[in-house]
């Protein structure tokens, strides 16, 4: 699948998504866009619960991805600044009229750092 495409078949419809409640979790969603109502050029989501940290990125590849290098760095005691430098590792961001590949990589690092700091990671 590509950008703005789904893996659903022609005769399938997504009707529900269930996520477990994380009562003791902290989280942050950071996005960069031109105007508030625009799609994110790059977005970073961070969630933490009882020592576990999850990081996801949007618009850094053909589909949303987990930044597992960042998660592992946090798990091993790296600071938010150190871990966020790994945010774009392994990504193949699109280059389009909104942003080039290098700029998207820069945004991923900055937004991930902000998210880690805001969520207390």
Please tell me what each predicted stretch does:
Residues 1-121:
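C-terminal structural segment of proteins
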């Amino acid at each position: 699948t590509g950008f703005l495409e789904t893996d659903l078949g022609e005769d399938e419809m997504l009707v529900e998504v269930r996520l477990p409640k994380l009562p003791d979790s902290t989280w942050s969603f950071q996005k960069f866009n031109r105007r508030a109502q625009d799609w994110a050029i790059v977005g970073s989501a961070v969630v933490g619960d009882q020592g576990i940290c999850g990081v996801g990125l949007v618009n850094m590849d053909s589909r949303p991805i987990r930044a597992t290098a960042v998660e592992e760095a946090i798990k091993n005691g790296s600071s938010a600044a150190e871990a966020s430098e790994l945010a774009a590792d392994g990504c193949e961001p699109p280059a389009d009229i909104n942003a080039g590949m290098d700029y998207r990589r820069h945004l991923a690092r900055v937004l991930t750092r902000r998210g880690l700091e805001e969520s207390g990671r």
